[in-house]
């Protein structure tokens, strides 16, 4: 994954920058007192962290070595062998489940959901971290009582899942004249 040069409001902008695990953990360390007082820590999220699984694993490991709590937000679309490498360094997995129907999931997201559902089961069965299922509630896709009930029933079959979070859908649209 490369740093991107983009046009933002007509101007060239560099979006993001390359960083090392050391640089990231030094930044994280600045808030250590806050993490200690609040019981918080770091959460890897935004985009799909498992697309950079080695970096994610190394950053989570560095945080755990320093006694910092760790969490990952992901839709679990990577092979389980990849996910398994981060589990020893993870306290909490915030896993997105968008739909229980593979065909509808594929129609909406471009990929079926069987791998993600199986990974949810494997993470739960591993017992290596706490697992919270999160559902972005999206109008006309999964906002029915039946679908939310189906996801809740699936989550209820996973050992150790104590919470299911329903997340409101945000549509950030703008028009230019």
Kindly label every feature range from the protein language model.
Residues 1-17:
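Canonical Radical SAM [4Fe-4S] cluster-binding loop centered on the CxxxCxxC motif
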Residues 25-167:
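Conserved AdoMet/S-adenosylmethionine-binding subsite of the radical SAM
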Residues 174-177:
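Conserved small/polar residues in nucleotide/adenosyl-binding loops
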């Amino acid at each position: 994954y490369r740093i991107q040069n983009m046009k933002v409001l007509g101007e060239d902008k560099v979006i993001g920058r390359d960083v090392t695990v050391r640089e990231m953990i030094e930044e994280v360390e600045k808030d250590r007192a806050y993490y200690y007082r609040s019981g918080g820590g770091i959460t890897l999220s935004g985009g799909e962290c498992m697309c950079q699984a080695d970096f994610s694993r190394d950053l989570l490991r560095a945080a755990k070595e320093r006694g910092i709590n760790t969490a990952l937000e992901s839709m679990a679309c990577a092979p389980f062998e990849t996910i398994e490498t981060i589990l020893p360094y993870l306290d909490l997995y915030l896993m997105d489940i968008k739909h229980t129907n593979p065909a509808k999931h594929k129609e909406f997201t471009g990929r079926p959901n069987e791998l993600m559902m199986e990974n949810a089961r494997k993470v739960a069965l591993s017992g290596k971290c706490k697992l919270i299922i999160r559902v972005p509630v999206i109008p006309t896709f999964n906002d029915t009582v039946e679908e939310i009930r189906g996801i809740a029933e699936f989550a209820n079959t996973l050992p150790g899942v104590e919470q299911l979070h329903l997340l409101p859908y945000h549509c950030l649209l703008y028009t230019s004249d």
